[in-house]
Amino acid sequence: MAYDDERDLVAAAAVVLDGATLATVAEATAVGRISFPYVPGLLAFREIPTVLAALDALPCPPGLVVCDGYGLAHPRRFGLASHLGVLTGLPTIGVAKNPFTFAFAAPATPRGSTAALLAGTEEVGRALRTRDSVKPVFVSVGHRVGLANACAHTLALTPAHRLPETTRRADALCRRALREAGGATS
């Protein structure tokens, strides 16, 4: 997602990668008007319409949707990844840059190390180290994927960087879509 608050625009991108090579198979973007105010914890309502438009524009459905945000690891236990998964029926996971409000112990320094992301005693996700000695990402289930598989998919999508390739490529596409948007919106 990328926002242009001056023009009241939001851009979303969907990127489908080959699971074995991480080569781009398909990509699509959508640009729309911001139709929901910024409310912490309710970003899904602000982002979902444009995300759905980007997913609908893909020539092939993704086998897994990796959201730059949360699923179960959300104060309401229903973040963007959960919301999107329920609406589309697609398997979804959330991979966030920050832990939101949840407690966690730092995972060990090697790539692949994890630590539980806790809401009280409930494990709502995992802090996952995707690079040796680099700040972890925060993985949570969204829809139709277990936590261990969500972590395994995240590691497969992070061979060289902290963030999943899907997120990195989608971020670049969103920024480009906003630059090219001019007055055209979906």
Where do the model's predicted regions map?
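Catalytic-site beta-strand/loop segments enriched in glycine and acidic/polar residues
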Residues: L52-L84, T88-L90
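Short hydrophobic alpha-helical runs that function as membrane-insertion/retention elements
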Residues: P91-A96
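C-terminal binding/interaction regions
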Residues: I48, K97-N98, A106-S186
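A glycine-rich, hydrophobic loop/mini-helix early in the fold
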Residues: E6-P61
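Flexible, glycine/proline-enriched loop segments at strand-loop-helix junctions
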Residues: Y38-L42, C67-P75, V134-V141
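Short, ordered loop/turn segments at secondary-structure junctions
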Residues: Y70-G71, K97-F100
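Two-metal-ion RNase H-like nuclease active-site motif
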Residues: M1-D4
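Feature detects long, helix-prone N-terminal segments enriched in hydrophobes
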Residues: V65, T101, A105-A106
